[in-house]
Structure formats: C-alpha cells, structure tokens
Amino acid sequence: MSKKTDEILDSLKSLSLLEASELVKQIEEAFGVSAAASAGVVMAAPGAGGGASAAGEAAEEKTEFDVILESFDAAAKIKVLKEVRNATGLGLGEAKAMVEAAPKTIKEGASKEDAEALKKAIEAVGGKVTLK
C-alpha cells in the first residue's frame, strides 16, 4: 500500500466505536451510499449461483452464520446491550432498539469462529442466542 493509505488505515484503527459510527454516517452522506445496502449485496451473492451443487456444499459444512438474539434476562439487559454494541458497532439507541426487538438477527454472514465467540459472549452475560 502507499504511504497515504497506510496513514489513513492507522487513523481508522485509532477511532472509538462512536467516532467510527459517525464516520460511516458522514461517508454515507458525502458519497450517497449506504453501508447497510453493501452488506445486503454481500449476503445475496453466495445464494445467487450454483443451484443444487451449492445446496449440496452447504449441507456438508456451513461457513457463514447468522447470530440471532432470541431473548435475555431482564436483569442483564445492559450487559447484553454492551455486547451487541461491541459486536455490531451500532450506537447506543440503535443497539438498544435491536436488543429490545428480540428475537432479532444481530449479525449476518459471520464466520463460524466469530459467530461462536459472539454467542459465548452474549450467553455469558445473560442472553440466549441461536446460530442459523
């Protein structure tokens, strides 16, 4: 990479979650794009081709998982909320709405390792999670 892109990457690494969220919003406004739309396109691509052979491969070993918050202990709501914020990078209000809407998909297309780690983290603080 060029020196300029290395510097930008280093700057991005130092951002807090709140700053990163604000940056995403500014990029969306400046370039007329949506971060959510990009994720939808990525999610649609694996199912787009292959037909029966793709279904056979999926039956062998699934590589992408959706992490779904099914429910949570009311006393642990704040802890679950913090874990959801850490996993998604959402702001407080957005994460709160997501948690309160359980059952709700909190992460789509996660690798097996990431999905399992997130499931363990949320269950450790009082949430009930399923992987699909």
Swiss-Prot record:
Keywords: Ribonucleoprotein, Ribosomal protein. One of its GO terms (cellular component) is cytoplasm. Coiled coil: none annotated. It holds the Pfam family Ribosomal_L12_N. GO terms for biological process: translation. One of its GO terms (molecular function) is mRNA binding. InterPro entries: Ribosomal_bL12, Ribosomal_bL12_C, Ribosomal_bL12_C/ClpS-like, Ribosomal_bL12_oligo, Ribosomal_bL12_oligo_N_sf. The keyword Lipid metabolism does not apply. Belongs to the bacterial ribosomal protein bL12 family. Homodimer. Part of the ribosomal stalk of the 50S ribosomal subunit. Forms a multimeric L10(L12)X complex, where L10 forms an elongated spine to which 2 to 4 L12 dimers bind in a sequential fashion. Binds GTP-bound translation factors. Forms part of the ribosomal stalk which helps the ribosome interact with GTP-bound translation factors. Is thus essential for accurate translation. This is Large ribosomal subunit protein bL12. The gene is rplL.
